[in-house]
Curated annotation (Swiss-Prot):
This is Bifunctional protein FolD. Coiled coil: none annotated. Its EC number is 1.5.1.5, 3.5.4.9. PROSITE patterns: THF_DHG_CYH_2.
Length: 296
């Protein structure tokens, strides 16, 4: 079985991005800038933000973090976003989830300039994706990362049956729409399964490409997978494991041991889709910079 190594691809991609950033710095004296806003002190969010800042530094991009108190009002957050929208040195704006209850997440998404929405969550970017205008939008980072993996590993997709398990706005919906597009690493027949789908295994067993993004550890088992299928595991779940020092470990939505015995290719957890998400965030930020400076 082929292991689709997202960690390796993300390192390669960041090296390629650094070359482009260095070229732009030499030619213009400018570099892409990413600003992350974090509201509150969620420990997991703090880790994600640190990882993003580290990756920016590795590629030569400028990054900044705006920390706001958990009691911050929605209007105060929207005001900061408007300031960043008007800042020519900021090319990507990311508001780290989750947000406190007093803040409407959709209002925050709408407030971000679509040209700086490097998370790809703004309705304008999602609409352009659905319409097939990928050269004029930002694609949500996790689906975009999966597309990059399929392309770099030369996975045949044209005319294949892709089954996406999960319908979240972050992964499932944009992933399904992306796989419908007429691109080298897409152009599939697409089925979406979700919590209300009856007899999910009857669909997953038809998949040439199975993408699991349901948020349940080990949900996809070997008897649900077509022999020879390509399996992309988006899930990141922490489960108890007394054998580890911490007492827990990360597990995907797919039973790796069982499914790896029959799949032709598969992403591991960790080290599969996860590292690609941040890499594609940087790629989107660079693309925003290039569009803003007419460098494409």
């Amino acid at each position: 079985m082929l292991i689709i190594d997202g960690k390796k691809v993300s390192i390669d991609l960041k090296s390629e991005l650094k070359v482009r950033v260095d070229e732009h710095r030499a030619a213009t004296g400018k570099v892409p800038g990413l600003t992350v806003i974090i509201v509150g002190e969620d420990p997991a969010s703090q880790v994600y933000v640190r990882n993003k800042a580290k990756s920016c530094k590795e590629t030569g991009m400028h990054s900044s973090v705006i920390e706001m108190d958990a009691s911050t009002s929605e209007e105060a957050l929207l005001s900061r976003i408007r300031e960043l929208n008007d800042d020519p040195d900021v090319h990507g704006i990311l508001v780290q989830q989750p947000l406190p209850k007093q803040i409407d997440e959709f209002a925050v998404t709408l407030a971000i300039d679509p040209a700086k929405d490097v998370d790809g969550f703004h309705p304008e970017n999602l609409g352009r994706l659905v319409m097939g205008h990928l050269d004029k939008c930002f694609v949500s980072c996790t689906p975009y990362g999966i597309l990059e993996l399929l392309g770099r590993y030369n996975i045949e997709t044209k005319g294949k049956h892709c089954v996406v398990v999960g319908r979240s706005n972050i992964v499932g919906k944009p992933m399904a729409n992306l796989m419908l597009q007429k691109l080298d690493a897409t152009n599939c027949t697409v089925t979406i399964c979700h919590s209300a789908t009856k007899d999910i295994p009857s669909y997953t067993r038809q998949a040439d490409i199975l993408i699991a993004a349901i948020g349940k550890a080990g949900f996809i088992t070997a008897d649900m997978v077509k022999p020879g299928a390509v399996v992309i595991d988006v899930g990141i779940n922490r489960i108890d494991d007394p054998s580890t020092k911490s007492g827990s470990r990360l597990a995907g939505d797919v039973d790796y041991e069982g499914v790896s015995a029959i799949a032709s290719a598969m992403t591991p957890v960790p080290g599969g889709v996860g590292p690609m998400t941040i890499a594609m965030l940087l790629k989107n930020t660079l693309q925003s910079f290039e569009r803003a400076n007419n460098l494409q």
